[in-house]
């Protein structure tokens, strides 16, 4: 039974294969391609007649026809470009529309022969793909033998043979047996923007099956060297109007991979909604793929794309912050705003990346009133949702929509500026802090003035002292022994003072235990209560008393009560370190007796 289940699981993850020995003409291939594209974005082609010729040409590329490294890489993203790990990229673009000129031609005979064979096959299947999932008759006729654009890409590595699957580190053991080392491949993400991309050898490539989410970092390796691989691009997915979706591939550049991508002419509009032409979309993809080249030829466009990524990040971060703060407000029984460093781990977990304080302050740059960010008495930043009345909540638009509109307005102002475009949203600088009533702001300069006035009063009182206090007396000669004695005496006094403070602090907590016990006694027994909920409830209940306490003191008092009444109050620690308290019955008389015993032990 388990073997059958495993075989079914493997069949689900298998790439669809078109066997040309079974289907060959267009009438037979069209329904097959349509059925594949409704569920997949990758398929293999088996028993291609010229596959042996392609393999021989690919082998010659690795050993004989080396790329011309002296031609450079121009603003059209054509030529030869050195990459990492001794890998070279060779790329050529061709367009039948005379409005766009790509003057660099491919002079490599083997690469040209590969291009001619891949182009005929790729153009045929590109037309099939468009007819399969694109309903517009005008778009179905946009690709033909006289109207097209192509991009030929080749990766070259001198040591590429060491990374081929079958010949990876092959050697012969003393026994005469063959032994092979398996090298770990280094994959890079590859997202075609055209209608279709064809690979002459389905090897050193990984794809994402349709059963996996786009954000899931799970890939399935393809090792079918006797097949050609076809992968649809983002243009076909956009023109299909939801009938077809595509996802990125992962390729190993060190495996000397060659690919051919096919478009309609690059001046073709993507849609009638003013989204630009195919050339704009291709330029954007090339800028993202080669940022170093774009920094030289298209610095402004590169900055705009990076700023777009930053805007996408802050929009997603705002949505997550809304969720976290709303859940935090529901779980807390007091209106005390949470500290920002307490919220960051949960926000980072939901964002699936590390979020720091400056990332939160970027939201205030877009919308300064999005959140109430203040400094508490401990010097920590607190973050809370702004107060809104019910009428405003019902009549105004959602906060997320309001933030998106403000973000778009801020973005348009930045890119409309003639100055150098920033690549990220700057963090908001907090120059003011709110008063305790949240009704007005107190300038830091006023605070400094107030403190300086207080110092002036202190100085005036000090000047009224006698003259002898300002005269330096002559120091008596001292020895090293007396100095050590004074240091030891100072340490003893410091230790005694610290012990006295700790004792008084414990006495203060013991005094507050009665009030906290009354709060617990008023709650429903037999119910679980988190330490966060109880601490915030205790702080809120005692904030109007003579000696209010904080959440830290409340947690220590709860632990002390559980230590005095271990049979009555139980505590359990769940995943993440959160403590949960529960009690069934509480006796005030018994607690009073045990509390007196606890206080007497502290005095002793």
Swiss-Prot record:
Note: Present with 2190 molecules/cell in log phase SD medium.
Phylogenetic classification of the source organism: Eukaryota, Fungi, Dikarya, Ascomycota, Saccharomycotina
GO MF terms held by the record: DNA replication origin binding
A GO-annotated cellular component: cytoplasm
Biological process, per Gene Ontology: cell division; double-strand break repair via break-induced replication; pre-replicative complex assembly involved in nuclear cell cycle DNA replication; regulation of DNA-templated DNA replication initiation
InterPro entries noted in UniProt: Cdt1_C (IPR032054), Cdt1_C_WH_dom_sf (IPR038090)
Keywords, sorted A to Z: Cell cycle, Cell division, Cytoplasm, DNA-binding, Mitosis, Nucleus
Subcellular location: Cytoplasm; Nucleus
Protein name as it appears in the record: Cell division cycle protein CDT1
Pfam families registered for this protein in UniProt: CDT1_C (PF16679)
Gene3D superfamilies given in the database record: DNA replication factor Cdt1, C-terminal WH domain (1.10.10.1420)
Keyword Cell cycle among UniProt keywords: yes
Subunit structure: Associates with the MCM2-7 complex. Interacts with MCM2, ORC1, ORC2 and ORC6.
Protein's organism: Saccharomyces cerevisiae (strain ATCC 204508 / S288c)
Family the UniProt entry places it in: Belongs to the Cdt1 family.
Chief subcellular location: cytoplasm
Purpose of the protein: DNA replication licensing factor, required for pre-replication complex assembly. Faithful duplication of the genetic material requires 'once per cell cycle' DNA replication initiation and elongation. Central to this control is the tightly regulated formation of prereplicative complexes (preRCs) at future origins of DNA replication. Required for the recruitment of the MCM2-7 helicase complex to the replication origins.
């Amino acid at each position: 039974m388990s073997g059958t289940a495993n075989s079914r699981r493997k069949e689900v993850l298998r790439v669809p294969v078109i066997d040309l020995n079974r289907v060959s003409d267009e009438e037979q291939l069209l329904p097959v391609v349509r059925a594949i594209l409704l569920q997949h974005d990758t398929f293999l082609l088996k028993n291609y007649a010229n596959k042996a010729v392609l393999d021989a040409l690919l082998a010659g590329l690795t050993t004989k026809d080396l790329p011309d490294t002296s031609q450079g890489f121009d603003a059209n993203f054509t030529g030869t470009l050195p990459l990492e790990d001794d890998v070279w990229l060779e790329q050529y673009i061709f367009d039948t529309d005379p409005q766009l000129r790509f003057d660099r031609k491919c002079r490599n005979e083997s690469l040209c022969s590969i291009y001619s064979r891949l182009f005929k096959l790729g153009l045929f299947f590109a037309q099939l793909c468009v007819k399969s999932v694109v309903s517009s008759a005008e778009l179905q006729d946009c690709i033909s033998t006289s109207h097209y654009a192509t991009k030929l890409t080749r990766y070259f590595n001198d040591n590429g043979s060491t990374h081929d699957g079958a010949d990876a580190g092959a050697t012969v053991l003393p026994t005469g047996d063959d032994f092979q080392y398996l090298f770990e491949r280094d994959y890079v993400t590859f997202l075609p923007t055209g209608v279709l991309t064809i690979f002459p050898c389905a090897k050193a490539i990984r794809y994402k099956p349709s059963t996996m989410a786009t954000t899931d970092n799970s890939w399935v390796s393809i090792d079918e060297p006797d097949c050609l691989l076809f992968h649809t691009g983002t243009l076909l997915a956009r023109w299909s109007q939801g009938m077809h979706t595509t996802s990125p591939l992962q390729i190993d550049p060190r495996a000397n991979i060659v690919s051919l991508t096919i478009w309609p002419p690059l001046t073709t509009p993507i849609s009638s909604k003013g989204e630009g032409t195919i050339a704009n979309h291709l330029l954007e993809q090339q800028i993202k793929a080669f940022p170093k080249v774009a920094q030289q030829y298209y610095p402004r466009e590169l900055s705009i794309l990076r700023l777009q990524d930053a805007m996408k990040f802050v929009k997603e971060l705002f949505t997550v912050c809304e969720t976290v703060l709303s859940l935090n407000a529901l779980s807390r029984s007091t209106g005390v705003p949470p500290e920002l460093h307490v919220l960051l781990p949960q926000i980072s977990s939901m964002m699936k990346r590390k979020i720091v304080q400056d990332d939160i302050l970027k939201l205030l740059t877009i919308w300064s009133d999005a959140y109430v960010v203040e400094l508490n008495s401990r010097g920590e930043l607190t973050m809370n949702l702004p107060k809104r009345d019910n009428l405003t909540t019902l009549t105004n638009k959602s906060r997320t929509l309001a933030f998106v509109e403000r973000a778009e307005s801020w973005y348009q102002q930045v890119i409309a500026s003639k100055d150098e475009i920033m690549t990220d949203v700057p963090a908001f600088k907090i120059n003011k802090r709110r008063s305790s009533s949240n009704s007005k702001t107190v300038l830091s300069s006023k605070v400094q003035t107030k403190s300086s006035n207080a110092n002036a009063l202190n100085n005036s009182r000090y000047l009224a002292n006698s003259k002898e206090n300002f005269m330096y007396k002559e120091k008596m000669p001292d020895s090293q022994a007396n100095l050590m004695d004074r240091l030891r005496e100072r340490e003893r006094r410091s230790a005694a003072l610290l012990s006295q403070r700790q004792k008084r602090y414990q006495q203060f907590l013991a005094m507050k235990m009665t009030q906290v016990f009354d709060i617990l006694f008023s709650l429903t027994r037999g119910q679980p209560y988190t330490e966060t909920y109880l601490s915030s409830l205790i702080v809120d209940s005692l904030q109007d008393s003579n000696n209010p306490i904080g959440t830290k003191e409340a947690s220590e008092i709860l632990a002390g009560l559980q230590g005095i009444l271990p049979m009555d109050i139980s505590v359990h620690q769940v995943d993440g370190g959160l403590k949960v308290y529960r009690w069934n019955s509480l006796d005030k008389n018994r607690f009073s007796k045990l509390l007196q015993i606890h206080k007497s032990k502290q005095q002793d």
